[in-house]
Amino acid sequence: MERIKELRNLMSQSRTREILTKTTVDHMAIIKKYTSGRQEKNPSLRMKWMMAMKYPITADKKITEMIPERNEQGQTLWSKVNDAGSDRVMISPLAVTWWNRNGPVASTIHYPKIYKTYFEKVERLKHGTFGPVHFRNQVKIRRRVDINPGHADLSAKEAQDVIMEVVFPNEVGARILTSESQLTITKEKKEELQNCKISPLMVAYMLERELVRKTRFLPVAGGTSSVYIEVLHLTQGTCWEQMYTPGGEVRNDDVDQSLIIAARNIVRRAAVSADPLASLLEMCHSTQIGGTRMVDILRQNPTEEQAVDICKAAMGLRISSSFSFGGFTFKRTSGSSVKREEEVLTGNLQTLKLNVHEGYEEFTMVGKRATAILRKATRRLIQLIVSGRDEQSIVEAIVVAMVFSQEDCMVKAVRGDLNFVNRANQRLNPMHQLLRHFQKDAKVLFLNWGIEPIDNVMGMIGILPDMTPSTEMSMRGVRVSKMGVDEYSNAERVVVSIDRFLRVRDQRGNVLLSPEEVSETQGTEKLTITYSSSMMWEINGPESVLINTYQWIIRNWETVKIQWSQNPTMLYNKMEFEPFQSLVPKAIRGQYSGFVRTLFQQMRDVLGTFDTTQIIKLLPFAAAPPKQSRMQFSSLTVNVRGSGMRILVRGNSPIFNYNKTTKRLTVLGKDAGTLTEDPDEGTAGVESAVLRGFLILGKEDRRYGPALSINELSNLAKGEKANVLIGQGDVVLVMKRKRDSSILTDSQTATKRIRMAIN
């Protein structure tokens, strides 16, 4: 107080005021404080003080040639006095105004390309539709979401290499562009940005937005794809939500959505094959999504979904350490347990072998439409706090938690036998048996569970067995909360192992995922999914199987032809004929197969009876295990278009139609490809032309090894002999000529000699 009085006293004297306002500051410490370092100590003051001066800006001298000395109002735009300490000119803020109005206009052609993500966002918002605002409690849960629509899925390192290559191509530093996407993007961007005048740093920032997925952990109630997240601040508050339909889609959301659909289809299909893991890998490697290889997408895309994670595990990639049960993602937040096998009796006195988890554990459960916190001990649910969008979602969460708890009253609530099977007709494991049972009907489970009186806790309410809310009573241990449970934020990935049946385990042997956890939801993919694997032919129905099978034979005709004559059994066992079997009526499959195999054997035995069209047409029928019978068929039935259709053994039919003139095969009216050789022109065509330079020595001679296809002949050395398979399924012995002179006459003699060798 004394000090303040003293200061007031001093300030009342005019001399004090004069000293403080007029004298220069010459205390070294003060000068040091305001002048050391590059950092401005009082930016706003500095700005105000600078702008109060007449010429606060400095610029390169050449600006004086581009800006007049005075503007239209006669105000001076730049000073003739040089800036102290540099050879730059001092410029008035008015010069900036003049430049903005009258300065040169640069080309704007690159702006939409560089600021692509912004231009696209404006378009989406322009075409988006905002609906009504609803006031209601928002159950938001924090989820990891993509906040950057329209990006490619490169890793930070990959993107950095692309950016350096595009923006600073001459900088030193090793950059290795390896992935397909890196190379495509680099080429595209280099072309787009020729003669671009925008600052390289800005270009680099904008490219980063385009190439890398940026995620944040945000509270969301509703759509989580990036086109919804970009308007999160407009669509949901604490107590309101605004309906919104985006005005456009972005590729990254489409990739995520299509990847999930492809992965689900592949896991479902692999689960029913003889070797699920091998099949799954084969399908992942041969599938493309929107023109990009699925395996490349899996390596880069962080989407966490059960089927996607199974595919990643199969490829040896790390996945999240949380596990899945009943469509919920469980993450243990505390406690620990040990597994012990125990036999329990259901209410129907059926014995189940359960892997019981002994110990106290706490979990968060996060599903699509409900979330929960679960505390459990050995075979006992202690507490379940659940929140969901609607009654149905809450029921789903409660059922999953009750089954997961392994409580005795849950096992005893089973009525009837448990015999659920998976797609491959194998019995499900006991936990999934119980889950399926109560997912069908949970009435008995809820009634048997027991109820208890509850305390009044803010934000929580009880729930009765018939799913009505109550403030007095609740099912034992179960409460419904207004607040959602956040998704587990840790993005840590762990090394996992996968067994032949696609069960994914962590390093401690806990099962994290299995095909039973893959959702059965069907959806329509946004991007084209191309499954090249024959295992996926049936996904589009019987017609697709039929067409794909015949297309495959035609595409591989050269090798098929050799196998047909040399090693038919191997050919019949090819997996490409597997899907076709489902089209042939079960009762007669074996007879058809026996009939066709006998027919083929006759063709092999009787020279000159080889008939390409017939072999192609009947080959798929020979793949089933044959039954020996005397039956002859003039037509074979296949089940397509909802009924049996007939393929004629000799001649064309609506199913299989070969046009000799155009050499085109149509299956069910759809083009199935062109045969590269004509089955009915004898041997004079392709063979005699290709056999120029070879001498035909006579019939096949086994000492010279298996028959080669015509394409393989080019590998022979001069004078070398080999057996070769010619168009009619006949094998002849040839020798490559030692001289080239007589090549012209070869084609005539070839034709004669082939006839002689055969006959």
Swiss-Prot record:
GO terms for cellular component: host cell mitochondrion; host cell nucleus; virion component. The record marks 627 as: Mammalian adaptation. Keywords: Cap snatching, Eukaryotic host gene expression shutoff by virus, Eukaryotic host transcription shutoff by virus, Host gene expression shutoff by virus, Host mitochondrion, Host nucleus, Host-virus interaction, Inhibition of host innate immune response by virus, Inhibition of host MAVS by virus, Inhibition of host RLR pathway by virus, Inhibition of host RNA polymerase II by virus, mRNA capping, mRNA processing, Viral immunoevasion, Viral transcription, Virion. One of its GO terms (biological process) is symbiont-mediated suppression of host gene expression. A motif (Nuclear localization signal) lies at residues 736-739. Influenza RNA polymerase is composed of three subunits: PB1, PB2 and PA. Interacts (via N-terminus) with PB1 (via C-terminus). Interacts with nucleoprotein NP (via N-terminus). Interacts (via N-terminus) with host MAVS (via N-terminus); this interaction inhibits host innate immune response. Belongs to the influenza viruses PB2 family. This is Polymerase basic protein 2. It comes from Influenza A virus (strain A/China:Nanchang/11/1996 H1N1). The gene is PB2.
